[in-house]
Amino acid sequence: MESEKSKFDYYIVTPDSLFERVDGIPMTKEEIRLISLNRLGVRNGGHFLDIGTGTGSVAVDMSRLAGPNGKIIALDRDEKAIKLARINLDRLSPYKNIQLVLADAYAYSPADSFDAIFIGGGTGDLPNLVSKYVPFLKSGARVVINAIQVKTLNDAVESLELNNFRNVSVIEVQISVGMKTGSSYAMIARNPIFVVSGEQP
């Protein structure tokens, strides 16, 4: 029988259907992960931070792309999210290269520097959050922020520009998914997501 970890060998990112879910704990959907991970530039042997890991979906795919010599820190302030992320990482991550941390992102102090940081949720004050982590970014490191609300989008762009990030980019992603209705399919729209990214000098 095919194992859970081998099922995603056919995919660039792990299918949403393979993740355990709990109501109230957010998950970055696979289409958004694909774009976000590309913008992050996750590579073999790199060091990456996932802020607001939720279900752990981004961390799982970071783990695969970073390989056995990579290192991922997945951070969340919600104990239920950390427990759920642990279940998903144990089932789906092919490498033991992820450290789960229960902490508020504004209070957490990393011991190392990062090649890229993903900010996916639980971020009420983006300008201060981005400023806090700038000293922990390597030269040329990337930050990617996912936003649903327009205010969060504006805060994300402002945060990167105030910290002198280069090549600040905004992509709006609108996904519709086909649902069987009788003999045909109806396209059901999901919420639009803004993917904001920038590079450290």
Swiss-Prot record:
The keyword S-adenosyl-L-methionine applies. Its EC number is 2.1.1.196. GO terms for molecular function: cobalt-precorrin-6B C5-methyltransferase activity; protein methyltransferase activity. Pathway: Cofactor biosynthesis; adenosylcobalamin biosynthesis; cob(II)yrinate a,c-diamide from sirohydrochlorin (anaerobic route): step 8/10. It comes from the Archaea. S-adenosyl-L-methionine binds at T28, G52, T53, G54, T55, G56, D76, A105. Gene3D superfamilies: Vaccinia Virus protein VP39. Coiled coil: none annotated. It catalyses: Co-precorrin-6B + S-adenosyl-L-methionine = Co-precorrin-7 + S-adenosyl-L-homocysteine + CO2. NCBIfam families: CbiT. PANTHER family: COBALT-PRECORRIN-6B C(15)-METHYLTRANSFERASE (DECARBOXYLATING) (PTHR43182), COBALT-PRECORRIN-7 C(5)-METHYLTRANSFERASE (PTHR43182:SF1). Belongs to the methyltransferase superfamily. Archaeal-type CbiT family. This is Probable cobalt-precorrin-6B C(15)-methyltransferase (decarboxylating). The gene is cbiT.
